[in-house]
UniProtKB/Swiss-Prot annotation:
Localization of this protein: Cytoplasm
Name under which the protein is recorded: Bifunctional protein GlmU
Pfam families: Hexapep, NTP_transferase
GO cellular component terms attached to this protein's record: cytoplasm; membrane
Requisite cofactors: Mg(2+)
One of the record's GO molecular function terms: magnesium ion binding
Catalytic activity: alpha-D-glucosamine 1-phosphate + acetyl-CoA = N-acetyl-alpha-D-glucosamine 1-phosphate + CoA + H(+); N-acetyl-alpha-D-glucosamine 1-phosphate + UTP + H(+) = UDP-N-acetyl-alpha-D-glucosamine + diphosphate
Residues given in the record as Mg(2+) binding sites: D103, N228
Binding annotation for UDP-N-acetyl-alpha-D-glucosamine: 9-12, 23, 73, 78-79, 140, 155, 170, 228, 333, 351, 366, 377
Region described as N-acetyltransferase: 252-456
PANTHER family attached to this UniProt entry: BIFUNCTIONAL PROTEIN GLMU, NUCLEOTIDYL TRANSFERASE
Organism annotation: Bacillus licheniformis (strain ATCC 14580 / DSM 13 / JCM 2505 / CCUG 7422 / NBRC 12200 / NCIMB 9375 / NCTC 10341 / NRRL NRS-1264 / Gibson 46)
């Protein structure tokens, strides 16, 4: 197999987005457009991948990191000029180069692989990725001869009435013989209204030289969508969400309402897990089998074990074990680790804390900077007082301890193994194992005193 290379065009400013954010960094299902493109291209067994950057170059490099090499297009003078910037990296190579726009996040590796196969089969100097559009207005048309070969590409504004009836369009993705590409690109002129150097001119030059120009038609027009404004961005979001959700359902995950379920492209979900409407799964989330998530829950960069049930809750940058129940209305904040068979109930907030197996905080608690052992019960309204206004301190509750309702544990403090803290206590000192700690004022009953209050 010939060596393969890729050039991703990502230098345009994207003024139609009307945004401070560089166009190709706008996310689709939580992942920047250009990263979708690069990740799919990297599946093609490439020798080198070069991203052409311009506006926002440093931001793009920071996002993609070592996934790509980079070439700078300091002035945006057209697509051929952009590809030419990769000559110092690819110009001396032999093989096939695929050129992809960085604003086509829906393009798949499978389609690109099929295009490369067609390119090799036809022994072409260039192969154009085409699609059939129901409304081809604005697209360049693929005009074929009587043999079905590509005769020319005609831009919409230059097309005759007959040519405008053609629905096969140029998607802007190409395969080139690498040597032919970088030799011919030097011949491209900017003699046009915009004064720019256009990549389709390379195709025209090769065609005029008698070289083979092929086309591969994808059956999925949606895949070729270029995102140039917020309307197209929303369309790409819808198509990508449908693709992701379909993949999970085909892999054995039940989505009760796919149209109202948002799953990141990086998520991994086990079989027989059920996702209810309004669920948002962002970033690198891994969910085990037979879990139940929803409704209206948000998971971000976290792991969730098998058979765990999460209801109307938020989990961020944390680990949750097997057979856990969370919610409704719980918040698991970053750097928390929840063991197996744990119960985190309604209106419980956990921050940077670890819960051992079978421990419970069932109602109305704040647990921050804490290490909770196994089989611990935190009663309703239990609070770890972890902050003195300047510093955070740690609370440790050992195995089998019982914390009564409405208790305040003022850190740093340790509750020993099997200890009991009486309801309503404010604990400021360590409690030994097996001890009962009572830290509240003694109750005083004043007989008939209520009458004096009622008379006021």
């Amino acid at each position: 197999m010939d060596k393969r290379f890729a050039v991703v065009l990502a230098a345009g400013q994207g003024t139609r987005m009307k945004s401070k954010l560089y166009k190709v960094l706008h996310p689709v299902c939580g992942k920047p457009m250009v990263e979708h493109v690069v990740d799919e291209a990297r599946k093609l067994s490439l020798e080198k991948l070069v991203t052409i950057v311009g506006h926002g170059a440093e931001d793009v490099k920071k996002q993609l990191g070592e996934k790509s090499e980079y070439a700078l297009q300091a002035e945006q003078l057209g697509t051929a000029h952009a590809v030419k910037q990769a000559k110092s990296i690819l110009g001396s190579e032999k093989g096939t180069t695929i050129v992809i726009c960085g604003d086509t996040p829906l393009l798949t590796a499978e389609t690109m692989e099929a295009m490369l196969t067609e390119h090799q089969k036809k022994a072409a100097k260039v192969t154009i990725l085409t699609a059939v559009a129901e409304d081809p207005t604005g697209y360049g048309r693929i005009i074929r001869n009587e043999n079905g070969d590509v005769a020319k590409i005609v831009e919409h504004k230059d097309a005759t009435e007959e040519e405008r009836l053609v629905k096969e369009i140029n998607t802007g993705t190409y395969c080139f013989d690498n040597e032919a590409l970088f030799q011919t690109i030097e011949q491209v002129s900017n003699d046009n209204v915009q004064g720019e150097y256009y990549l389709p001119d390379v195709i025209e030059i090769l065609k005029n030289q008698g070289e083979t120009v092929a086309a591969y038609q994808t059956v999925n027009f949606q895949e070729t969508l270029g995102v140039n404004d917020r309307v197209a961005l929303s369309q790409a979001e819808i198509y990508m969400k449908q693709r992701i959700n379909k993949r999970h359902m085909q892999n054995g995950v039940s989505l009760i309402d796919p149209d109202n379920t948002y799953i990141s492209p990086e998520a991994v979900i086990g079989r027989d897990t059920v996702i209810y409407p309004g669920t948002v799964i962002k970033g690198r989330v891994v969910i085990g089998e037979d879990a139940v998530i929803g409704q209206n829950s948000e998971l971000e960069n976290s792991t969730v074990g098998s058979r765990t049930v999460i209801k109307q809750s938020v989990i961020v940058d944390s680990e949750v074990g097997d057979d856990v129940t969370i919610g409704p209305f719980a918040h698991i904040r970053p750097d928390s680790k929840i063991g197996n068979e744990v119960r985190i109930g309604n209106f419980v907030e956990v921050k940077k804390s670890e819960f051992g197996d079978r421990s419970k905080a069932s109602h109305l608690s704040y647990i921050g900077d804490a290490e909770i052992g196994t089989d611990v019960n935190l009663g309703c309204g239990s609070i770890t007082v972890n902050y003195d206004g300047k510093h955070k301190f740690k609370t440790k509750i050992e195995n089998g301890a019982f914390i009564g309702c409405n208790s305040n544990l003022v850190a740093p403090v340790t509750i020993g193994e099997g200890a009991y803290v009486a309801a309503g206590s404010t604990i400021t000192d360590d409690v030994p194992g097996r001890a009962l700690s009572i830290a509240r004022a003694r109750q005083v009953n004043k007989e008939d005193y209520a009458e004096n209050i009622h008379k006021k």
